[in-house]
Amino acid sequence: MNLGEKLTEGKTKIVYAHPNDPTLAIIIHKDGISAGDGARRHIIPGKGALSGRTTANVFTMLNHAGVATHFVAAPEPTVMIVRRCVMIPLEVVNRRIATGSYIRRHPDVAEGTRFDPPLLEFFLKDDARHDPQISPEEIVAQGIASADEVEQLASESRRVFLLIEEAWAAQDIVLCDLKIEFGRDASGALVVADVIDNDSWRIWPGGMKERMLDKQVYRNMPVVTDDGLEQVRRLYEEVAHRTDAWVNR
Protein backbone atom coordinates (compact mmCIF):
# COMPACT_ATOMS: atom_id res chain seq x y z
CA MET A 1 0.00 0.00 0.00
CA ASN A 2 1.05 3.62 -0.41
CA LEU A 3 2.90 5.18 2.49
CA GLY A 4 3.62 8.73 3.57
CA GLU A 5 6.84 9.92 5.18
CA LYS A 6 8.52 7.74 7.77
CA LEU A 7 7.76 9.13 11.21
CA THR A 8 9.75 6.76 13.41
CA GLU A 9 11.25 3.29 13.46
CA GLY A 10 11.72 0.97 16.41
CA LYS A 11 13.01 -2.54 16.95
CA THR A 12 9.76 -4.21 15.87
CA LYS A 13 7.83 -1.65 13.81
CA ILE A 14 7.98 1.32 11.47
CA VAL A 15 5.45 4.16 11.63
CA TYR A 16 4.56 6.15 8.53
CA ALA A 17 2.28 9.09 7.91
CA HIS A 18 -0.87 8.19 6.00
CA PRO A 19 -0.51 9.44 2.41
CA ASN A 20 -4.03 10.87 2.22
CA ASP A 21 -5.25 11.57 5.75
CA PRO A 22 -3.16 13.62 8.21
CA THR A 23 -5.20 12.28 11.15
CA LEU A 24 -4.04 8.71 10.47
CA ALA A 25 -0.76 6.81 10.54
CA ILE A 26 0.36 3.41 9.25
CA ILE A 27 2.28 0.91 11.37
CA ILE A 28 4.32 -1.79 9.64
CA HIS A 29 5.21 -4.76 11.84
CA LYS A 30 8.77 -6.02 11.36
CA ASP A 31 10.15 -9.54 11.77
CA GLY A 32 12.59 -8.49 14.47
CA ILE A 33 12.67 -9.74 18.05
CA SER A 34 14.89 -8.34 20.77
CA ALA A 35 15.58 -8.51 24.48
CA GLY A 36 17.70 -6.69 27.01
CA ASP A 37 16.95 -3.23 25.56
CA GLY A 38 18.14 -4.47 22.18
CA ALA A 39 21.30 -6.20 23.40
CA ARG A 40 19.94 -9.44 21.90
CA ARG A 41 18.39 -9.11 18.43
CA HIS A 42 17.26 -11.62 15.83
CA ILE A 43 15.00 -11.91 12.82
CA ILE A 44 12.18 -14.46 12.77
CA PRO A 45 10.64 -14.65 9.28
CA GLY A 46 6.89 -14.21 9.56
CA LYS A 47 6.92 -12.77 13.08
CA GLY A 48 5.74 -9.37 11.86
CA ALA A 49 2.60 -10.87 10.34
CA LEU A 50 1.91 -12.91 13.48
CA SER A 51 2.43 -9.91 15.76
CA GLY A 52 0.22 -7.81 13.50
CA ARG A 53 -2.51 -10.44 13.58
CA THR A 54 -2.39 -10.67 17.37
CA THR A 55 -2.40 -6.90 17.78
CA ALA A 56 -5.34 -6.48 15.40
CA ASN A 57 -7.29 -9.14 17.31
CA VAL A 58 -6.57 -7.51 20.67
CA PHE A 59 -7.46 -4.00 19.53
CA THR A 60 -10.60 -5.19 17.75
CA MET A 61 -11.77 -6.83 20.98
CA LEU A 62 -10.95 -3.70 22.99
CA ASN A 63 -12.75 -1.44 20.51
CA HIS A 64 -15.83 -3.65 20.70
CA ALA A 65 -15.68 -3.39 24.50
CA GLY A 66 -15.74 0.41 24.27
CA VAL A 67 -12.09 1.05 25.11
CA ALA A 68 -10.65 4.10 23.35
CA THR A 69 -7.75 2.92 21.17
CA HIS A 70 -5.89 4.21 18.14
CA PHE A 71 -6.75 1.14 16.06
CA VAL A 72 -8.71 1.67 12.83
CA ALA A 73 -8.05 -1.33 10.57
CA ALA A 74 -5.54 -3.99 9.56
CA PRO A 75 -5.75 -4.29 5.76
CA GLU A 76 -2.76 -6.65 5.58
CA PRO A 77 -1.14 -8.98 8.15
CA THR A 78 1.84 -6.67 8.69
CA VAL A 79 -0.05 -3.39 8.22
CA MET A 80 -2.15 -1.48 10.73
CA ILE A 81 -3.95 1.82 10.15
CA VAL A 82 -4.26 3.87 13.33
CA ARG A 83 -5.32 7.27 14.53
CA ARG A 84 -2.25 9.45 14.67
CA CYS A 85 -1.15 10.11 18.25
CA VAL A 86 1.52 11.83 20.26
CA MET A 87 2.86 8.99 22.35
CA ILE A 88 3.30 9.31 26.11
CA PRO A 89 6.79 8.00 26.97
CA LEU A 90 5.58 5.51 29.56
CA GLU A 91 5.08 1.78 29.79
CA VAL A 92 2.06 1.05 31.97
CA VAL A 93 2.28 -2.41 33.54
CA ASN A 94 -0.40 -4.33 35.42
CA ARG A 95 0.70 -7.48 37.26
CA ARG A 96 -1.50 -10.33 38.47
CA ILE A 97 1.35 -12.76 39.20
CA ALA A 98 4.74 -11.85 40.63
CA THR A 99 7.38 -12.93 38.13
CA GLY A 100 10.05 -11.49 35.84
CA SER A 101 11.58 -8.14 36.75
CA TYR A 102 9.24 -7.70 39.70
CA ILE A 103 10.79 -10.51 41.74
CA ARG A 104 14.28 -9.35 40.78
CA ARG A 105 13.42 -5.93 42.20
CA HIS A 106 11.55 -7.43 45.16
CA PRO A 107 13.46 -10.58 46.20
CA ASP A 108 11.35 -10.80 49.37
CA VAL A 109 8.27 -11.60 47.24
CA ALA A 110 7.90 -15.23 46.18
CA GLU A 111 7.46 -15.92 42.48
CA GLY A 112 3.85 -16.80 41.79
CA THR A 113 2.44 -14.45 44.43
CA ARG A 114 -0.97 -13.26 43.26
CA PHE A 115 -1.91 -9.58 43.34
CA ASP A 116 -5.59 -8.81 43.80
CA PRO A 117 -6.31 -6.22 42.53
CA PRO A 118 -3.56 -6.24 39.89
CA LEU A 119 -0.44 -4.31 40.87
CA LEU A 120 0.18 -1.17 38.79
CA GLU A 121 3.64 0.11 37.84
CA PHE A 122 4.88 2.86 35.52
CA PHE A 123 8.19 2.81 33.64
CA LEU A 124 9.80 5.66 31.71
CA LYS A 125 10.61 4.68 28.12
CA ASP A 126 14.37 5.25 28.02
CA ASP A 127 16.52 2.42 26.61
CA ALA A 128 19.74 4.14 27.68
CA ARG A 129 18.56 4.02 31.31
CA HIS A 130 16.90 0.59 30.93
CA ASP A 131 13.35 1.97 31.26
CA PRO A 132 13.51 3.01 34.94
CA GLN A 133 10.47 2.76 37.16
CA ILE A 134 8.79 6.10 37.78
CA SER A 135 6.20 7.12 40.35
CA PRO A 136 2.92 8.90 39.60
CA GLU A 137 4.26 11.95 41.43
CA GLU A 138 7.39 12.01 39.26
CA ILE A 139 5.28 11.65 36.11
CA VAL A 140 3.36 14.78 37.07
CA ALA A 141 6.45 16.69 38.27
CA GLN A 142 8.29 16.00 35.00
CA GLY A 143 5.33 17.19 32.93
CA ILE A 144 4.81 13.81 31.27
CA ALA A 145 1.13 13.71 32.21
CA SER A 146 -1.22 15.58 34.50
CA ALA A 147 -2.52 14.12 37.75
CA ASP A 148 -5.92 13.52 36.12
CA GLU A 149 -4.24 11.80 33.18
CA VAL A 150 -2.23 9.56 35.52
CA GLU A 151 -5.48 8.46 37.14
CA GLN A 152 -6.92 7.76 33.69
CA LEU A 153 -3.82 5.78 32.69
CA ALA A 154 -4.24 3.69 35.82
CA SER A 155 -7.95 3.04 35.41
CA GLU A 156 -7.89 2.39 31.66
CA SER A 157 -4.84 0.12 31.85
CA ARG A 158 -6.55 -1.94 34.55
CA ARG A 159 -9.69 -2.14 32.42
CA VAL A 160 -7.62 -3.38 29.48
CA PHE A 161 -5.84 -5.90 31.70
CA LEU A 162 -9.11 -7.31 33.04
CA LEU A 163 -10.61 -7.64 29.55
CA ILE A 164 -7.58 -9.48 28.21
CA GLU A 165 -7.30 -11.55 31.39
CA GLU A 166 -10.90 -12.70 30.94
CA ALA A 167 -10.29 -13.57 27.29
CA TRP A 168 -7.25 -15.69 28.16
CA ALA A 169 -9.01 -17.30 31.14
CA ALA A 170 -11.65 -18.64 28.74
CA GLN A 171 -8.82 -20.73 27.25
CA ASP A 172 -7.43 -21.73 30.68
CA ILE A 173 -4.46 -19.40 30.28
CA VAL A 174 -3.28 -17.12 33.08
CA LEU A 175 -2.34 -13.56 32.14
CA CYS A 176 0.54 -12.86 34.53
CA ASP A 177 1.26 -9.29 33.49
CA LEU A 178 0.61 -6.84 30.68
CA LYS A 179 2.54 -3.85 29.36
CA ILE A 180 0.69 -1.24 27.30
CA GLU A 181 1.26 2.30 26.07
CA PHE A 182 -0.94 5.33 25.56
CA GLY A 183 -0.99 8.32 23.25
CA ARG A 184 -2.91 11.56 22.89
CA ASP A 185 -5.05 11.81 19.77
CA ALA A 186 -5.70 14.99 17.79
CA SER A 187 -8.21 16.17 20.40
CA GLY A 188 -5.79 15.52 23.26
CA ALA A 189 -7.74 12.52 24.54
CA LEU A 190 -5.84 9.53 25.90
CA VAL A 191 -6.09 6.34 23.84
CA VAL A 192 -4.48 2.92 24.12
CA ALA A 193 -1.83 2.95 21.39
CA ASP A 194 1.28 1.25 20.00
CA VAL A 195 0.87 -2.55 19.82
CA ILE A 196 -0.35 -5.32 22.13
CA ASP A 197 1.10 -8.63 21.01
CA ASN A 198 3.05 -11.61 22.31
CA ASP A 199 5.87 -9.27 23.36
CA SER A 200 3.48 -7.39 25.66
CA TRP A 201 2.52 -10.01 28.23
CA ARG A 202 3.41 -13.18 30.06
CA ILE A 203 0.87 -15.97 29.61
CA TRP A 204 0.97 -19.37 31.32
CA PRO A 205 -1.41 -22.13 30.17
CA GLY A 206 -2.98 -23.76 33.19
CA GLY A 207 -1.07 -21.30 35.35
CA MET A 208 2.14 -23.27 34.75
CA LYS A 209 5.26 -21.21 34.08
CA GLU A 210 6.98 -24.10 32.29
CA ARG A 211 4.26 -23.96 29.59
CA MET A 212 4.71 -20.25 28.85
CA LEU A 213 3.73 -19.12 25.35
CA ASP A 214 5.25 -15.64 25.27
CA LYS A 215 8.47 -13.78 24.51
CA GLN A 216 10.00 -14.90 27.81
CA VAL A 217 10.94 -18.16 26.04
CA TYR A 218 13.29 -16.11 23.83
CA ARG A 219 14.63 -14.10 26.76
CA ASN A 220 15.42 -17.28 28.68
CA MET A 221 17.50 -18.92 25.94
CA PRO A 222 21.15 -19.18 27.06
CA VAL A 223 22.14 -19.45 23.39
CA VAL A 224 19.85 -18.58 20.50
CA THR A 225 19.83 -21.17 17.71
CA ASP A 226 17.84 -21.52 14.51
CA ASP A 227 15.82 -24.29 16.15
CA GLY A 228 15.17 -22.01 19.12
CA LEU A 229 13.94 -19.21 16.87
CA GLU A 230 11.63 -21.66 15.10
CA GLN A 231 10.25 -22.68 18.49
CA VAL A 232 9.55 -19.01 19.24
CA ARG A 233 7.88 -18.55 15.85
CA ARG A 234 5.58 -21.51 16.54
CA LEU A 235 4.59 -19.99 19.89
CA TYR A 236 3.76 -16.67 18.24
CA GLU A 237 1.73 -18.56 15.64
CA GLU A 238 -0.19 -20.40 18.36
CA VAL A 239 -0.92 -17.16 20.21
CA ALA A 240 -2.11 -15.44 17.02
CA HIS A 241 -4.40 -18.39 16.34
CA ARG A 242 -5.74 -18.35 19.90
CA THR A 243 -6.52 -14.63 19.75
CA ASP A 244 -8.47 -15.16 16.51
CA ALA A 245 -11.18 -16.58 18.78
CA TRP A 246 -11.53 -13.20 20.50
CA VAL A 247 -12.97 -11.61 17.36
CA ASN A 248 -14.73 -14.63 15.87
CA ARG A 249 -17.03 -15.46 18.76
Swiss-Prot record:
Which InterPro entries does this one have? SAICAR_synt/ADE2_N, SAICAR_synthetase, SAICAR_synthetase_CS
Keyword annotations for this protein, in alphabetical order, are:
ATP-binding, Ligase, Nucleotide-binding, Purine biosynthesis
GO terms for MF: ATP binding; phosphoribosylaminoimidazolesuccinocarboxamide synthase activity
Which Pfam families did the record assign? SAICAR_synt
What are the EC numbers? 6.3.2.6
Q: Name one GO biological process term.
A: 'de novo' IMP biosynthetic process
Pathway named in the protein's UniProt entry: Purine metabolism; IMP biosynthesis via de novo pathway; 5-amino-1-(5-phospho-D-ribosyl)imidazole-4-carboxamide from 5-amino-1-(5-phospho-D-ribosyl)imidazole-4-carboxylate: step 1/2
Q: Which reaction does it catalyse?
A: 5-amino-1-(5-phospho-D-ribosyl)imidazole-4-carboxylate + L-aspartate + ATP = (2S)-2-[5-amino-1-(5-phospho-beta-D-ribosyl)imidazole-4-carboxamido]succinate + ADP + phosphate + 2 H(+)
UniProt record similarity statement:
Belongs to the SAICAR synthetase family.
This chain belongs to the protein called Phosphoribosylaminoimidazole-succinocarboxamide synthase
Supply the source organism for this entry.
Answer: Roseiflexus castenholzii (strain DSM 13941 / HLO8)
